[in-house]
């Protein structure tokens, strides 16, 4: 998409859009946008403003978390998986995670938010719709932020005024084809920022299922990540503080409890995305095959998180904390017949439309914003601000929860491990978790770079399979 202008087909949403019941966490809601009479009607509509696909599968294929595994019997799931891994133009349109599906579905979410906002803005009693307006603005901002993460360059304040952005529809279109100017990345981020700030002021918390909606906590986690990517590090810290409060430890996942569960079937994945887990701030229910392809099924083995990547760079790699799978609260799942080395985090459930024909829809649930990831957002922002003691405190708070014996690091531990004497920079011949940064902004070699290497290394492990690694690759020019 290198053209300055483009056409978007704003596709009308299906009248009954929504995911059907699938275990206790899938929930179908009617689309009542054609009969909006009350704030409750708008709330029901806004269920469809949360995109029903997720880029994790695509972004994991793009990122350095995935390797090509050559062995008889290990095949690609389909041509889409091969095209994504090989970084060629993706011509496939049928899987749920293709760029074309992602594009149209996220713009559908924007359209839904705009329908809600149009109705709200036409009402005499605006105050009755304050919470719905806040949620609609946050959903629009989130959809556009996610589109930017896939289809745009990483934000860089030195180039954002010339880097291409994306169209940002702010009204309901009545024509099928509307011509939009892409604008710049600076324009796009400014519009996301505006919606985010207004939405944060209005967002409510009165939902039947709050973990599936933006609340003050999940919206603040979104803001923390957004401002980190926007290179506004003070604001990233500010909003992370709103999530974590004065006792971040109390917000974090009970990794030991999760690790104690069986890695077989869907036990660990369902526990990981449970709405009862305090650390899970926003859950996203989507149509996706990633729970199978990135999971324990013998499916899509050719392009997967391999033994080499696992042992040298990620979940079995050595870090300043020790050997990761010996130190951390998880069990690496693998069997002799699989190329994959995985953590059981993404559930897979197949909803049959016709059991006899084997036709239906695969589903997954993602923990899109969590307290643990927000803590590492704050740690990274503190490091980029030069607040190394605060960054180390956050790192150690996460390590205390994530590790079996509460391992703690000193600044010297971090600097020593990510030094040339101990861990050389990655090369294809000698892979390591330490990868060279290529950023427009300066990073000091003595303390800042080792701290950032450590935070990115831990985030890569902790969020494996969730699609976030690709954003670090983009932001740091890895």
Predicted regions located by residue number:
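Membrane-proximal, proline-rich intrinsically disordered regions
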Residues: 22-69, 298, 467, 477-478
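Aromatic-residue-lined binding/catalytic grooves and analogous aromatic/hydrophobic interfacial grooves
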Residues: 23, 217-256
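Hydrophobic-face positions in mid-chain alpha helices that act as interaction patches
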Residues: 237-372, 405-442, 458, 462-468, ...
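Sec-dependent bacterial lipoprotein signal peptides
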Residues: 1-22
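Conserved, well-structured interaction surfaces
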Residues: 80-152, 183-186, 196-205, 359-366, ...
């Amino acid at each position: 998409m290198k053209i300055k202008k483009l056409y978007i087909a704003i596709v009308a949403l299906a009248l009954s859009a929504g995911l059907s019941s699938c275990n206790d966490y899938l929930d179908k809601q009617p689309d009542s946008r054609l009969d909006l009479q009350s704030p409750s009607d708008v709330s029901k509509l806004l269920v469809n403003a949360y995109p029903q696909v997720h880029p994790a599968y695509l972004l994991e294929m793009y990122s350095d978390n995935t390797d090509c595994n050559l062995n008889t019997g290990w095949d690609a799931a389909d041509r889409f998986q091969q095209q994504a891994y090989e970084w060629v133009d993706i011509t496939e349109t049928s899987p749920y995670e293709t760029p074309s599906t992602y594009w149209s579905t996220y713009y559908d979410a924007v359209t839904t938010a705009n329908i809600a906002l149009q109705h709200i803005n036409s009402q005499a009693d605006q105050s009755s719709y304050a919470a719905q307006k806040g949620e609609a603005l946050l959903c629009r901002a989130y959809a556009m932020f996610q589109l930017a993460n896939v289809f745009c360059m990483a934000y860089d304040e030195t180039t954002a005024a010339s880097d291409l952005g994306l169209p940002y529809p702010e009204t309901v279109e009545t024509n099928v084809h509307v011509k939009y100017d892409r604008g710049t990345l600076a324009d796009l981020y400014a519009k996301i920022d505006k919606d985010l700030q207004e939405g944060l002021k209005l967002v409510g918390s009165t939902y039947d299922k709050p973990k599936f909606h933006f609340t003050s906590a999940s919206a603040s986690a979104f803001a923390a990540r957004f401002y980190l990517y926007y290179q506004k590090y003070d604001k990233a810290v500010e909003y992370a503080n709103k999530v974590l409060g004065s006792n971040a430890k109390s917000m974090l996942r009970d990794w030991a409890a999760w690790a104690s569960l069986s890695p077989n079937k869907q036990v660990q994945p369902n526990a990981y995305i449970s709405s009862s887990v305090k650390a899970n701030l926003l859950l996203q229910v989507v149509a996706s095959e990633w729970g199978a392809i990135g999971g324990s099924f013998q499916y899509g083995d050719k392009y997967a998180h391999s033994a080499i990547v696992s042992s040298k760079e990620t979940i079995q790699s050595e870090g300043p904390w020790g050997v990761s799978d010996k130190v951390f609260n998880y069990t690496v799942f693998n069997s002799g017949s699989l190329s994959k080395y995985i953590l059981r985090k993404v559930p897979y459930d197949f909803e049959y439309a016709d059991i006899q024909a084997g036709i239906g829809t695969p589903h997954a649930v993602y923990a899109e914003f969590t307290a643990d990831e927000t803590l590492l957002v704050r740690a990274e922002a503190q490091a980029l601000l030069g607040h190394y003691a605060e960054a180390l405190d956050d790192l150690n708070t996460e390590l205390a929860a994530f590790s079996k014996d509460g391992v703690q690091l000193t600044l010297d531990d971090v600097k020593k491990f990510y030094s040339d004497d101990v861990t050389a920079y990655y090369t294809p011949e000698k892979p390591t978790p330490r990868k060279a940064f290529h950023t427009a902004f300066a990073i000091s070699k003595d303390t800042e770079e080792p701290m950032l290497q450590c935070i990115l290394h831990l985030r890569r492990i902790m969020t494996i399979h969730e699609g976030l690694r690709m954003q670090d690759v983009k932001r740091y020019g890895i």
